């Protein structure tokens, strides 16, 4: 088994991956349909209403973070996921029924978006933490990256198929199709060999989420990761708003919008697969990806034609997934196992909770000044995140310039600063391969 796919050695992970691909395809089909329904069927191209829908859907993870992280740590994650996946399937059927009978309204769609958000608030941290239950710690970063690859394989297919189904059959049937795909994930969870799951570390302390907050507060590296992800998540990752309004600007319909989402996934899938090749997640990769995202977003905003814009989206997708996969893997592999669920709940609250803040703003900017202006705001947020990351690395001593123009890494990026013993910096050449080649510490300096 190659290094890129080493997590497939686990039966449970192979089963999970297969179910996730099918379910994620349906999820992307539904996301495309929901965005298009709000933008064109329930409103007259109102991007602000679309932003409100996204805020309602992604707000609950932020509001419920104190509960969802505790649930992910306290209860059997497989059973939690069976519950959330079944609930999401029933909600999809509910939306389908209202659309097919012609009684769906914007307030009702807002209510369903909030219900999806509440359910996903419990699903996301349990789903992320469950990855570490299926594979060893050494393979966790690889499994996280392959999860992202699964997500983006689905993103490559789902939006395009969803757009075609909207044109051919109508939006309601897309929600029906998504409900059916949830069965794949439910069956995969039922087929799990529970005796092969990695034993979980029980935390007997009663600190709840406060303990997770204290843990993150004592980890400057995690704080920087959270801030960078928040900035880009709030203002740069409003792709449904950007892609749908740009599709309309270029005179495209639902199929053109779906194709843009699929093109974005080409770069996303590439980024996920490259991340799977790395043996661990590193902060500097996250920082570089944030800068790449900012530049690619600004370039995309200037594109004069539909196909030129679509081409640049490949680079936007690549940098986005490289950043998110690295951040996720870093949080998972450097967090104390007993607190992993709570810390991941905080991370998911930052990732998903940033949307309620940024999406309405992006929608308003798109309505008032045009979609290109909204994309520029996202690009600037990416460059700001890059600046914060570089500034922290310089301030913390992780990275500094030498007179011979080579960079030095002075600390192991996969550990909290407090646990790394003092050592002399080790130089490496400033060339392209340095970004993906881990730097090994001498054995006698490791804990």
Predicted regions: what they are:
Residues 1-429:
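Alpha-helical transmembrane-bundle signature of multi-pass membrane transport and export proteins
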Residues 216, 430-447:
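Long, low-complexity, intrinsically disordered segments
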């Amino acid at each position: 088994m190659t290094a890129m796919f080493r997590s497939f050695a686990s039966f449970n992970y192979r089963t999970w991956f297969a179910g996730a691909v099918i379910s994620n395809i349906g999820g992307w089909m539904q996301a495309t349909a929901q965005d298009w329904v709000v933008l064109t069927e329930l409103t007259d191209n109102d991007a602000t209403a679309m932003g409100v829908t996204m805020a309602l859907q992604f707000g609950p993870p932020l509001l419920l973070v104190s509960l969802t992280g505790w649930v992910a740590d306290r209860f059997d994650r497989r059973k939690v996921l069976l519950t959330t996946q079944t609930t999401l399937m029933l909600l999809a059927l509910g939306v389908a029924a209202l659309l097919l009978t012609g009684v769906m309204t914007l307030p009702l769609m807002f209510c369903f978006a909030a219900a999806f958000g509440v359910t996903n608030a419990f699903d996301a941290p349990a789903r992320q933490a469950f990855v570490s239950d299926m594979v060893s710690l050494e393979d966790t970063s690889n499994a996280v990256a392959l999860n992202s690859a699964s997500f983006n394989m689905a993103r490559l297919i789902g939006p395009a198929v969803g757009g075609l189904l909207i044109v051919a059959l109508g939006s309601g049937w897309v929600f029906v199709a998504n409900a059916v795909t949830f069965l794949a994930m439910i069956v995969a969870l039922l087929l799990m060999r529970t005796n092969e799951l990695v034993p979980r570390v029980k935390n007997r302390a009663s600190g709840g989420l406060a303990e997770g907050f204290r843990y993150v507060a004592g980890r400057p590296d995690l704080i920087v990761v959270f801030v960078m992800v928040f900035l880009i998540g709030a203002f740069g990752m409003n792709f449904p708003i950007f892609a749908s309004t740009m599709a309309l600007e270029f005179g495209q319909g639902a199929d053109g919008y779906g194709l843009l989402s699929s093109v974005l996934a080409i770069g996303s899938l590439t980024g996920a697969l490259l991340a799977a090749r790395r043996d661990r997640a590193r902060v500097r990769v996250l920082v570089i990806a944030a800068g790449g995202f900012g530049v690619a977003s600004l370039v995309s905003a200037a594109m004069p034609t539909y196909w030129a814009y679509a081409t640049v989206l490949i680079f936007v997708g690549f940098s986005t997934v490289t950043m998110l996969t690295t951040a996720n893997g870093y949080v998972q592999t450097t967090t104390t196992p007993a607190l992993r669920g709570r810390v991941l709940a905080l991370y998911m609250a930052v990732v998903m909770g940033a949307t309620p803040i940024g999406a309405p703003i992006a929608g308003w900017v798109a309505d008032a000044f045009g979609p290109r202006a909204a994309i520029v705001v996202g690009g600037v947020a990416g460059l700001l995140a890059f600046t914060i990351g570089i500034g922290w690395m310089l301030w913390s001593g992780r990275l500094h310039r030498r007179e011979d123009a080579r960079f030095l890494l002075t600390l192991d990026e996969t550990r909290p600063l407090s646990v790394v013993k003092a050592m002399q910096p080790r130089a490496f050449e400033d060339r392209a391969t340095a970004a993906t080649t881990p730097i090994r510490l001498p054995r006698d300096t490791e804990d």
